[in-house]
Amino acid sequence: FTHKIETIGEMSCNPAIGGLGKGHLVREIDALDGVIGDVADKSGIQFRLLNRSRGPAVRGPRTQTDRSLYKKYMQEKLLNYCNLSVFSDPVIKFVFDKKSVKGFITHSGKLIKTSKLILTTGTFLNGLIHVGDNQTPAGRYNEKPTTGLSEQLKKFNFKIGRLKTGTPPRLDARTINFENLEEQCADDDPYFFSFLTKENLNKQVSCRMTYTNDEVHKIISKNLKRSAMYSGSI
């Protein structure tokens, strides 16, 4: 049960999979027959093995991802997965019998009975977006959060906390002079996430790097108090 089937696989924050401390987790999920590694490989547009010059223990596979392709392939995976039914009807309340969960009630008023329930919160459980001075309840940009479930869980002594992720502003490629930027190419021998992936499906795209200067630092320092991280909002 989810808010919208058409937003399954929407990448809430940065369009990348893996990285240092995370890439090996994606491969472990793949080893357990999870789908994220396969979908990441099919939608990857720049594969790099980070820390390649160092020992194997600190290397981290990462791919920059085509967001549209990732969503497309993830939906195809889930909507055709054996013994999995997907419904657009968010859960608004758990149903308990003493201390055991017995089901849930959906936004449309349906009572679904179950002996086991897996809550996949993502960024939606009491989600809150900070943009400068402004705060907006949201699961992700322009999507409503899930409210009420946290309060129920607190009554059963679940510890409820909040995790933070930062999303950099998006830049319009048409406004950038790439000739003045340092090119960072994809690896010639891509390190895939899934053990089943044999070849790359997409044209690889270079990243571009630039650097700050004193003027940029002045702008940051002048406006630092407006950042949610430094104003005390987070």
Predicted segments, located by residue:
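Conserved acidic residues
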Residues: 102, 115
